[in-house]
């Protein structure tokens, strides 16, 4: 595990970020984020990450060189627009926070309604039970056919939550993610499309 990744996780932890937000920011699973925030100092002192069993293996994805550039993001959005050529829809819903820039560019390119879904992991409240919500232009997608956009899908939980919420007010037709780590092709009858997919290959000597 890279020292840089451990340092980033610890920095975000010290800034008050919960494990869910750290996982999204670093494109790792919540389980890995929790492991790093709890054991990061010891890992740095040891000089290397101890060998872990296969259940703790995770893949770290970094695409800062793309998402930091509006021009490069627009090029990615054009690829997704091309993949949407056979899909009839009225609106684009970006999952906060990683999916919002892409959803904005896609809706602009195709002249579609735009909205944001804020997952419950980003809702900071003292209530035990909380839900996500539509954060912008809800009226523009009610009763409409929509697509869902996110940057990275790790466990699929945020996408599943978004689909469940939207099915109560709209008709989610497809989900588009840049990078898929989950290997999931469909959630609740909604197809998941990806630009790139990662996986772990167990090579035995």
Curated annotation (Swiss-Prot):
The record's note on its domains: Contains an N-terminal DNA-binding winged helix-turn-helix domain and a C-terminal regulatory domain (or effector binding domain) resembling phosphoribosyltransferase (PRT) domain.
PROSITE patterns, per database record: PUR_PYR_PR_TRANSFER (PS00103)
Keywords noted in UniProt: DNA-binding, Transcription, Transcription regulation
Listed name of the protein: Transcriptional regulator GfcR
HAMAP family: GfcR (MF_01214)
GO BP terms, alphabetized: pyrimidine nucleobase biosynthetic process; regulation of gene expression; UMP biosynthetic process
Organism: Methanococcus maripaludis (strain C7 / ATCC BAA-1331)
MF (Gene Ontology): DNA binding; orotate phosphoribosyltransferase activity
Record-linked InterPro entries: GfcR-like, PRibTrfase_dom, PRTase-like
Domain of life the protein comes from: Archaea
Paired cysteines (S-S): none
Family named by the database record: Belongs to the purine/pyrimidine phosphoribosyltransferase family. GfcR subfamily.
UniProt cross-references to PANTHER family, sorted A to Z: OROTATE PHOSPHORIBOSYLTRANSFERASE, PYRE-LIKE PROTEIN
